[in-house]
Amino acid sequence: MPKYRSATTTHGRNMAGARALWRATGMTDSDFGKPIIAVVNSFTQFVPGHVHLRDLGKLVAEQIEASGGVAKEFNTIAVDDGIAMGHGGMLYSLPSRELIADSVEYMVNAHCADAMVCISNCDKITPGMLMASLRLNIPVIFVSGGPMEAGKTKLSDKIIKLDLVDAMIQGADPKVSDDQSNQVERSACPTCGSCSGMFTANSMNCLTEALGLSQPGNGSLLATHADRKQLFLNAGKRIVELTKRYYEQNDESALPRNIASKAAFENAMTLDIAMGGSTNTVLHLLAAAQEAEIDFTMSDIDKLSRKVPQLCKVAPSTQKYHMEDVHRAGGVLGILGELDRAGLLNCNVKNVLGLTLPQTLEQYDITVTQDEAVKKMFRAGPAGIRTTQAFSQDCRWDSLDDDRSAGCIRSLEYAYSKDGGLAVLYGNFAENGCIVKTAGVDDSILKFTGPAKVYESQDDAVEAILGGKVVEGDVVVIRYEGPKGGPGMQEMLYPTSFLKSMGLGKACALITDGRFSGGTSGLSIGHVSPEAASGGTIALIEDGDTIAIDIPNRSIQLQLNEAEIAARREAQEARGDKAWTPKNRQRQVSFALRAYASLATSADKGAVRDKSKLGG
């Protein structure tokens, strides 16, 4: 029988000092012996996805205490990728994932907590907490802050839905008036919550649901809706049950590594491909799998991407549907239900509620459930009122969207495309692979060949795009922006948005060893591995070289013979200490970022730290 970890600090005469300090936090004699559960919050006023979380940690803590546990709350950092976008701040986004994972490990192990409730929401916070959870392998439940309501405004006598990306595109489009740009900016992000499309934050919160580590509805139920409160109350109660199951009944099925098994990871990636999730999810699932000691690689993702269709299309891939519409159509379990009927899921998995996948689908798939409370929950909709308050409204759709032929979520028969929403490409400058969000690529450019325009920083590429130096047919290559080369693997949302602003969204391709925001669409290929700074062939591409992209055949090729590539590699190596570094880039890199770069692996490894350099 496992011993409560917290007993290390609460039992025995030699722990009198620790108990004295615990008493100073409010604990009493009756608390010593109860499970100590960490409430891992991420409240900050910097991030709309987290601005409403201050009181939610207290809500969970109160439920833990009422259920027989002792709750202790702490916060992690949280970077807003949208605010950090387009300047040096973006260098810090991906590295913050490792800091979050480490900080959770530090706090939980230093104080010997028995279990955790992780209150996350945005881009690197959910992945960081997920990595920590699988590293620590103690009982955990995730409950996120929830999606933002979609922005809405009237343009050309028509009400349209908006998000952050629309504001960026309109702001950079010289054809758009100042008044219209201002109108869109003020309408794009109306409430607290993670940005309203299938961007990285919402993608990851959907994937924690598919992994079994969060409750039904977690990925899609709006931040503002009163129904979401129940997820937090349930999490506080359920984590105590999970904790006692493990420590008092020796039930290892309560542990996250047994819930988020390899089968669960495959199901999560299948969901991601079917819903056209953010390409960043590939990085994060690879990283989380390594923490769980699961053999889950780019090869597994490639195999899944070749057989899973696209069953859901959401902003930024379409303006018609946002997360509020996904929820109305049944949320994550609506998509999983269709994937199950298509025979594409492994049903031998359980979730934090203790339900198998078939049991969960029977209760929560809106096309089959008989539970009226579940149907009511999935009718939770937006209020259209600007607010930063959680649970502030109780509006509901008049009906569910259960139309699987023409609705937001489709059945296999009526799939948006037979190919899924993500694809892995390989070629002679992406030997270890690269990623494209096919859900956002127009059919007319699934095959694309053009001359390279090479830039060694995102800033230079943006200047060239806005300056008219990139023209129809070009393949924009942005390199030395990988995990090591950036360092920090910046998102390229501004270059892709500005290509659209200049009317080139369907006329150019963009390739990078950096990454893309979940808000990116278009022929945008990222995560090229190995990256330039690690000796990747992308560092050898020159202006005018022809690059051929063939998404249907999963191919990306630099059309040069091997002898020329070898000659360029030899010339690069001859640069000595300057080899595999940008020639003319001026960038101030802090010590903290240099430390990150010294251990960073390429994207095909999840951009995690290279354990071999630490002797592990």
Curated annotation (Swiss-Prot):
Locate the active site: 517 (proton acceptor)
User: Superkingdom of this entry's organism?
Assistant: Bacteria
Ligand binding ([2Fe-2S] cluster): 122, 195
- Gene name tied to this protein: ilvD
Recorded hits in HAMAP family, A to Z, give: IlvD (MF_00012)
EC id: 4.2.1.9
Native organism is Salmonella gallinarum (strain 287/91 / NCTC 13346)
In Swiss-Prot or TrEMBL terms, this protein is called Dihydroxy-acid dehydratase
Cofactor(s) essential for the protein: [2Fe-2S] cluster; Mg(2+)
- InterPro entries annotated for this entry? Dihydro-acid_dehy_C, DihydroxyA_deHydtase, DiOHA_6PGluconate_deHydtase_CS, ILV_EDD_C, ILV_EDD_N, IlvD/EDD_N
Record keywords, A-Z: 2Fe-2S, Amino-acid biosynthesis, Branched-chain amino acid biosynthesis, Iron, Iron-sulfur, Lyase, Magnesium, Metal-binding
User: Which reaction(s) are listed as its catalytic activity?
Assistant: (2R)-2,3-dihydroxy-3-methylbutanoate = 3-methyl-2-oxobutanoate + H2O; (2R,3R)-2,3-dihydroxy-3-methylpentanoate = (S)-3-methyl-2-oxopentanoate + H2O
Per UniProt, the cofactor note for this protein states: Binds 1 [2Fe-2S] cluster per subunit. This cluster acts as a Lewis acid cofactor.
The record's comment on protein family reads: Belongs to the IlvD/Edd family.
